[in-house]
């Protein structure tokens, strides 16, 4: 393990701050409507959607983004280990090329970006724009930090892996053969309970078409994840993140 830059060590807190700022745009004048509510009549005016179908289409988009984010992060964590995912230090003793890492080098960060897109529909338009751009740029920053560390740590095998596997957007087919790691789904799902809770909230409560209710569900999911993180042991073997 290696001590990491501060913006890597405190990445969970910084993500939380970015999402908080995104929601805080509601406090600005003339910014009291959710992006969901603003986009619905805009799509209706395009002539392709009725008001009802536009509302439902945006909800389905949010559900798909939230669910895909939760699945990708849990899938990646099942191979990587929740202890490594949550560690403040840089980890890279072994090259992991299993599960989602056969299709993208950064399934966790891609999942986080999709999660930001889902939450953006609950924010004001300016908050949504800020969040998607800020979270996207922050993912790139974290990726570059990790790539420099892993290239120095693992050498040519990692560079060869990078040539074959996309950095961010997953490929439909695996790009490398499996390395033999086994997934541990229970600890992964528990470690990603926040993402899972948000995805379930969108799927279950989204049909009430209430952005404020969904925002409360996000906060409840966050609280549950903080409690679990405080009590969950971190004894996982070190892989690349």
Describe the function of each predicted region.
Residues 1-98, 114-241:
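Membrane-anchoring alpha-helices and their flanking helix-loop junctions
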Residues 101:
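Catalytic beta-strand/loop module used to bind and position nucleotide/cofactor moieties
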Residues 104-114:
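Conserved SAM-binding loop
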